[in-house]
Amino acid sequence: MFGAGKPNVVLIYIDDLGYGDLASYGCKDIPTPHIDRLAKEGVRCTSSYITNPPCCPSRCSMLMGQYGQKFGKYGMSRGLSLPEDRPTLAQFLHGEGYVTGHIGKWDIGSRSQGPLQTGFSRAARTPPKKQYTKRELLRLSPSLRRKLEEKNGKSKYYCVNEDGKTMWLTDYDGDAMVEFVKDHKHERFFLYWSPEAVHSFNTEVPEHLMARTKAKGMRRYLAGAISSVDDQVGKLLDALESSALREKTLIVFSSDNGANGGEGGSSAPYSGGKGKGTQKEGWVRVPTIFSMPGSLPKGVTHEGLIANFDFYATIAGLVGTPAPPHCDGVNLLPFLRGEKKGSAHDYLFWLNNEPGDAVRRHLIAVRWKKWRLYRKYQKDRWQLFDLAADPHEENDVADKHPEIVTRLAERHGAWVKTLTPLREISKETSPAQRVTTGHGWETARKKRTPSGG
C-alpha cells in the first residue's frame, strides 16, 4: 500500500488555530491555499478533538498517544514530567530507525525533558528574538508598544538569523523544515513542527501578510499570522516534491486547541474557544488533515470521532509496527481510507480538573454521536446538547433525554476509574534541558528507548 520502505512523517501542530480559521473548513476571509491543498490531496477530519486542552497538556497527550489523565495530567500543570516507563511517539519512531526532528515551540514535560531527552535526535535551536530600540518602539502603535515594553523591548515574532538579519519567526521555522528535509531525504524521517504561531499576541504581523486577507479589525493580525503558517506549508510541499518524497510522506496537520476569540479567532460553526469560551465545543474541536497522495484518498471528509492521541497509533500503523500497549489511540488508516465506516471511538471523555485556574479550565464532558454531555464542576447538574441541531449549545435538552444523560454519565464514571490520580509537579534542581537559544541544530546523545508497557 505504501510502496517500498517505511514512509516519512511530518506532524504540524499549530498553536490556537480555530476550527473556523481555514478556508478548507469554511473560512471566507483568510486564504490558505497550501493548507487547502493538503485537504484536497488528503482527508479532512471534521470531528477531531483535544481531550486535554490547552497547549501544554494537549502536546503531552499527543506525544504520548494517550489521555493525559492516564499519566496524572488533568490541566495545564506546566512542568509535570512525562512518564518515562513508556515511549513517546518520537522514541517509538527512533526505535524504528527514523531520524526524528523537532522545530519550534516545545512546552512538553518537565524542565529536564526537552526534545533531545524524549526521543528527538535533532532539535532546531530557537533563534534569538529581535530587540527593539527605543526609537523603533516609538514608531509603533501605543498598544503594541506597551506589550513589547512589558517584555523589555524583546519581540515575540521577529528573530535574528545566522547572518544577523531580522526575520519573521514563522519564516525562519519554514526554512528549517526545508533544511531538515534536504538533509535527510535519503533516510526515513519524522519531523515535528510546532510553531509559536498563531498564539497571541499577533499585532507585530507585517502589513504584507495581512493585506492578502479580507479580515477586518483585530482579526487582521491573526489572519496575517495564519497566512505565514500557510506559506511554510507551501515551502514544505515544494521541498518534498523536489526531493521526490511527497508520495512517500504522511503530513498530519492539526492544532493544539481551539480558537482564541480575543485575537479574533473563529470556531465557526461552533461556539467557544480559548479565554471565555473554554466550556464549549469550540475549545476542543480542531481542524485536522491527513495527507499522503497515493496512499490516502484525495478530497475526502471523515466525520467520525477522532482525538489527537490517535496520531501515535495511526503513525505506528503506517510504519507497520503495533503501537505500544499504553496507547489509547486507534489506527485511523482504515477509517481514512474508507475501509471502515463510522467512528474510531464510540465515546470521547474530558476531565480537566485544573488546580491553577478552575474558573476557566475545569471541564467535564462526553462526546457520543451527535451528543455532548457537559458540566463544569462535579457538583453541577449535567447539561446535554444536540450539536447537529444546536452547534452553539444554546438549548440544554437534558430533561428531554434523561436516558442519554444516564448512559453517558455512566460511561464517564467508568472511564474515570481507569485514570491515574493527579500528580504533583516535582521541584527540579537540574539544569534545564529544553530547546536552547541560538542557530542551527542540537543532536541527541544515544540513549536507551523505553519499551513501553
Predicted ranges, named:
Residues 1-382, 389-417, 421-427, 435-453:
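Formylglycine-dependent sulfatase
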